């Protein structure tokens, strides 16, 4: 029979009607001579009741045979429950079963299909189709669908054109490693899966599309963590003839619309702006979490004359104050913080506590000459813990920024009901790579430098600033964008500054440079990480929870066993030979 409605949508107004439902058995129990069955579908649970005294014998026999996750079809009459269950949307009603059919049976599942499941991540991913049956997972994907629907409507209303860009592209240097796809037709040659549609969307601006968007899959072969996956989805925008403020206004409107439609939250516009330098100096991060205080304090000048070599000779000495929680940190727990700090390049972690009105701790004896001034500068009060890092400014900022976030989580200092958006602006164009031994793009090689710093492309690259902007939410980079270079000579200078010879620049980006000979308009754009945005809206801490079939931390899929070896014949067609490390 045709399904009448979803089980999770049956309500009191349906009492007295005969309906047909289809779904999975969540559980079955015998109670007081009656058989109760919880039927689950996409929209929720509905209680079914079989009374052996007045039900058909075949129905009773079928009901007795049911096990969890059997797929069933049931027809019956909606009745009011004797005792309502206020914890269920369908809790005021139940279905008196007249007909019951098993559509498919099920083996015992490797974990119970319910929220709060106790199973390893790999087990959940190995049986992802079962994991996705759980109500909280279904809700995540309903939220994701609503977010993308809202985004499309908003951008369509602003006359953006949805354009699909190629998945098989050219491998280019800079950024993360590419995923490569060998060509059978042009043997020895490779496509790359796009890390972003950056160049193609710029070319669409040269084509006169004016406003482009795409909700697009991107690929990066990089080390994984909770907010990264090898394949991910971004909301990609590009516009012509708009400045950075206008692009930011469009983005803020989009985010405000999503927040209103999906969470019922009114966000205040415009979002706060913070320079990159202020973010690093005050928060120790280019994606600051502003839901709590504990800002970094610069003590370099204050401690330069103390009788403590580590402080006196360090290029920078900075500190954070953990207010009112010193008693929660024993020497052992501070040693753990020290080990954590060393992961970010710090040689160690100095500390003092305010106990009975005086500073105490391993370095307190070196600070007696400045104790009063230090206490005043940092506003140290009873039971405060002060953590110091003495090192280069970069290491001090990065280490204390990471400690700030770690301690806030440990002490439950973060208000998880807040959505704190902000823009980080005034970015450096380049960042130094110790691994590469050279400057690399902080964003990408097509970012427009500020007019007053462009001359340094042939000078001190550390002084070149970018017309770039990142949008941050609760300590996560939600997205980033910039104005782009549209002048050929400036693009050539940028590539030269990055170490490209003229020959290599044209070999890699000749098609883009050639396009700049044909009236390339001023343009700029932005990309938002859709997976990360939905993760934060759903209150999750791993984007695997909002991606239907994600990879694990080894970039593998435990369900399909991808990546896998392929047949020798396939390799021969591609003129490839694979040598494994253990051969």
Curated annotation (Swiss-Prot):
Region entry Aspartate, spans: 198-201
A Pfam family that the UniProt record links to this protein: tRNA-synt_2
Ranges annotated as spanning the membrane: none
Q: Which UniProt keywords apply?
A: Aminoacyl-tRNA synthetase, ATP-binding, Cytoplasm, Ligase, Nucleotide-binding, Protein biosynthesis
Q: Where in the cell is it found?
A: Cytoplasm
Q: What residues does L-aspartate bind to?
A: 174, 220, 443, 484
Q: Which residues bind ATP?
A: 220-222, 229, 477, 529-532
Annotated EC: 6.1.1.12
Molecular function (GO) terms for this protein are: aspartate-tRNA ligase activity; ATP binding; catalytic activity, acting on a protein; nucleic acid binding; transferase activity
Tree of life domain: Bacteria
Q: Which family does it belong to?
A: Belongs to the class-II aminoacyl-tRNA synthetase family. Type 1 subfamily.
Q: What does this protein do?
A: Catalyzes the attachment of L-aspartate to tRNA(Asp) in a two-step reaction: L-aspartate is first activated by ATP to form Asp-AMP and then transferred to the acceptor end of tRNA(Asp).
| Name of the protein this chain belongs to | Aspartate--tRNA ligase
Species name: Streptococcus thermophilus (strain ATCC BAA-250 / LMG 18311)
Underlying gene:
aspS
């Amino acid at each position: 029979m045709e399904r009448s409605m979803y089980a999770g949508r049956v309500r009191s107004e349906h009492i007295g009607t005969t309906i047909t439902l289809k779904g999975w058995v969540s559980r079955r129990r015998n109670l007081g001579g009656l058989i109760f069955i919880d039927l689950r579908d996409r929209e929720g649970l509905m209680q079914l009741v079989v009374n052996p005294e007045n039900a058909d014998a075949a129905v009773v026999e079928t009901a007795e045979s049911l096990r969890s996750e059997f797929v069933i079809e049931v027809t019956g009459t909606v009745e009011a429950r004797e005792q309502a269950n206020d914890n269920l949307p369908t809790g005021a009603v139940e279905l008196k079963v007249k007909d019951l059919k098993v559509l498919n049976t099920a083996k015992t599942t490797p974990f119970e299909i319910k929220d709060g499941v106790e199973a390893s991540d790999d087990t959940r991913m190995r049986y992802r189709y079962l994991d996705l049956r759980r109500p909280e997972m279904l809700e995540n994907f309903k939220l994701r669908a609503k977010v993308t629907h809202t985004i499309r409507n908003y951008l369509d209303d602003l006359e953006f054109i949805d354009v699909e860009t190629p998945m098989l592209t050219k491998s280019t240097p800079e950024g993360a490693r590419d995923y490569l796809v060998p060509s059978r037709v042009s043997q020895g040659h490779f496509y790359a899966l796009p890390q972003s549609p950056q160049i193609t969307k710029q070319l669409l601006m040269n084509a006169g599309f004016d406003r482009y968007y795409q909700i697009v899959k991107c690929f990066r072969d990089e080390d994984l963590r909770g907010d990264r996956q090898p394949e991910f989805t971004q909301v990609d925008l590009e516009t012509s003839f708009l400045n950075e403020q206008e692009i930011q206004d469009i983005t803020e409107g989009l985010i405000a619309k999503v927040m209103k439609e999906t969470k019922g939250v009114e966000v205040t516009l415009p979002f706060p702006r913070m320079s990159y330098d202020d973010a690093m100096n005050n928060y120790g991060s280019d994606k600051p979490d502003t839901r709590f205080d504990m800002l970094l304090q610069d003590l370099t000048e204050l401690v330069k004359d103390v009788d403590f070599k580590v402080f006196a000779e360090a290029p920078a000495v900075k500190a954070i104050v953990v207010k009112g929680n010193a008693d929660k940190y024993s020497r052992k727990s501070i040693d753990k913080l020290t080990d954590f700090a060393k992961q970010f390049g710090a040689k160690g972690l100095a500390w003092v506590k305010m106990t009975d009105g005086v500073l105490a701790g391993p370095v307190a004896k070196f600070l007696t000459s400045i104790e009063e001034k230090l206490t005043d500068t940092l506003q140290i009060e009873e039971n405060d813990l002060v953590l110091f890092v003495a090192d280069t400014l970069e290491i001090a900022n990065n280490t204390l920024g990471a400690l700030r976030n770690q301690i806030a989580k440990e002490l439950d200092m973060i208000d998880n009901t807040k959505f704190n958006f902000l823009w980080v602006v005034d970015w450096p164009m380049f960042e130094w790579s110790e691994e590469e031994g050279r400057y690399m793009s902080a964003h990408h090689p097509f970012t427009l430098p500020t007019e007053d710093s462009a001359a340094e492309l042939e000078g001190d690259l550390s002084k070149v600033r970018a017309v770039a902007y990142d949008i941050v939410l609760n300590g996560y980079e939600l997205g980033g964008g910039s104005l782009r270079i549209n002048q050929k000579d400036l693009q050539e200078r940028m590539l030269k500054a990055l170490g490209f010879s003229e020959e290599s620049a044209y070999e890699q980006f000749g098609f883009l440079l050639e396009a700049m000979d044909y009236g390339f308009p001023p343009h700029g754009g932005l990309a938002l990480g859709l997976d990360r945005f939905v993760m934060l809206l759903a209150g999750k801490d791993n984007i695997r929870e909002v991606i239907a079939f994600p990879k694990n931390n080894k970039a593998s899929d435990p369900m399909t066993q991808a990546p896998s070896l392929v047949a020798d014949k396939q390799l021969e067609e591609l003129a490839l030979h694979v040598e494994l490390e253990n051969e």
